[in-house]
């Protein structure tokens, strides 16, 4: 701790601006003017008044500190999204707008990401697992979907190598979708497998709905779920729904019909 003229104590590390002023060539003239004014006002007090200088210095430091705090708050609020350590849990069938609220970004930012990947959506459209995975990779966030019905958590990160406990994994019958053009024998093949006459119950012997059948195979009576689909062009949306839930796709092409 140092002293100047035994009037003001200061810390050399904190009062650089004051030291500059002290070393300035105009300091002596300022000192003389101040002493002259003090003598005029009060002859008993001939000391230089450091209080006003100290007050100005403190005001300057306060403004500077306030600016630094505001700047830190600004940059913290505008940081890039980085949720690698945190997991964002979302429910199935979440919309773009709902996901944006969960992440804390504008819905337009998510739409931009999807648009760059050739996906044209609006804020009210539902995001499937593949789109959530795409958003997760582009925004570098960890999104996990929650299947409340089966109490399953699905992590969308493709590079996430989490250890799965076999005790919590339930075996289920694989779902096989049977696809093909109309009159190529999809339903006829299924009825041979399940030993049931299905075509007689169909209008015009043409499948116009999704048919689900259980097929037993192997010595241990393992089950396979067969999904029969309509082959007509008008039922494209039905086939798309089947594709989303299927594990295996079986494409049927009749040899006598050709491709």
From Swiss-Prot:
<dbReference type="Pfam" id="PF00009">
    <property type="entry name" value="GTP_EFTU"/>
</dbReference>
<feature type="binding site">
    <location>
        <begin position="180"/>
        <end position="187"/>
    </location>
    <ligand>
        <name>GTP</name>
    </ligand>
</feature>
<dbReference type="InterPro" id="IPR005225">
    <property type="entry name" value="Small_GTP-bd"/>
</dbReference>
<comment type="function">
    <text>One of the essential components for the initiation of protein synthesis. Protects formylmethionyl-tRNA from spontaneous hydrolysis and promotes its binding to the 30S ribosomal subunits. Also involved in the hydrolysis of GTP during the formation of the 70S ribosomal complex.</text>
</comment>
<keyword id="KW-0934">Plastid</keyword>
<dbReference type="InterPro" id="IPR015760">
    <property type="entry name" value="TIF_IF2"/>
</dbReference>
<dbReference type="InterPro" id="IPR000795">
    <property type="entry name" value="T_Tr_GTP-bd_dom"/>
</dbReference>
<keyword id="KW-0547">Nucleotide-binding</keyword>
<keyword id="KW-0342">GTP-binding</keyword>
<dbReference type="GO" id="GO:0005525">
    <property type="term" value="F:GTP binding"/>
</dbReference>
<dbReference type="GO" id="GO:0009507">
    <property type="term" value="C:chloroplast"/>
</dbReference>
<dbReference type="InterPro" id="IPR006847">
    <property type="entry name" value="IF2_N"/>
</dbReference>
<keyword id="KW-0150">Chloroplast</keyword>
<dbReference type="InterPro" id="IPR027417">
    <property type="entry name" value="P-loop_NTPase"/>
</dbReference>
<feature type="domain" description="tr-type G">
    <location>
        <begin position="171"/>
        <end position="259"/>
    </location>
</feature>
<dbReference type="Pfam" id="PF04760">
    <property type="entry name" value="IF2_N"/>
</dbReference>
<keyword id="KW-0396">Initiation factor</keyword>
<dbReference type="GO" id="GO:0003924">
    <property type="term" value="F:GTPase activity"/>
</dbReference>
<dbReference type="GO" id="GO:0003743">
    <property type="term" value="F:translation initiation factor activity"/>
</dbReference>
<comment type="similarity">
    <text>Belongs to the TRAFAC class translation factor GTPase superfamily. Classic translation factor GTPase family. IF-2 subfamily.</text>
</comment>
<keyword id="KW-0648">Protein biosynthesis</keyword>
<protein>
    <recommendedName>
        <fullName>Translation initiation factor IF-2, chloroplastic</fullName>
    </recommendedName>
</protein>
């Amino acid at each position: 701790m140092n002293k100047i003229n035994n009037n003001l104590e200061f810390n050399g590390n904190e009062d650089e601006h004051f030291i500059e002023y002290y070393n300035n060539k105009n300091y002596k003239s300022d000192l003389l003017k101040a002493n002259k004014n003090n003598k005029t006002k009060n002859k008993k007090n001939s000391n230089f008044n450091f209080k006003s200088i100290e007050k100005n210095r403190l005001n300057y430091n306060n403004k500077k500190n306030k600016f630094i705090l505001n700047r830190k708050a600004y940059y913290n609020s505008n940081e890039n999204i980085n949720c690698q350590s945190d997991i964002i849990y979302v429910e199935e069938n979440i919309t773009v707008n709902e996901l944006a609220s969960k992440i804390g970004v504008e819905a337009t930012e998510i739409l931009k990401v999807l648009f760059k990947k050739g996906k044209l959506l609006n804020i009210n459209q539902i995001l499937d697992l593949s789109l959530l995975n795409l958003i997760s990779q582009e925004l570098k966030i960890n999104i996990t979907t929650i299947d409340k019905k089966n109490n399953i958590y699905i992590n969308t990160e493709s590079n996430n190598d989490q250890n799965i406990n076999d005790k919590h994994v339930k075996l289920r019958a694989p779902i096989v979708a049977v696809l093909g053009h109309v009159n190529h024998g999809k339903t006829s093949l299924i009825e041979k497998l399940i030993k049931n006459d299905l075509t007689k119950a169909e209008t015009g012997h043409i499948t116009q709905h999704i048919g689900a059948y259980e097929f037993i195979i192997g010595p241990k009576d393992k089950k396979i779920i067969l999904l029969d689909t309509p082959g007509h062009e008008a039922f494209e949306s039905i086939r798309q729904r089947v594709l989303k839930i299927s594990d295996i796709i079986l494409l049927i092409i009749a040899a006598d019909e050709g491709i």
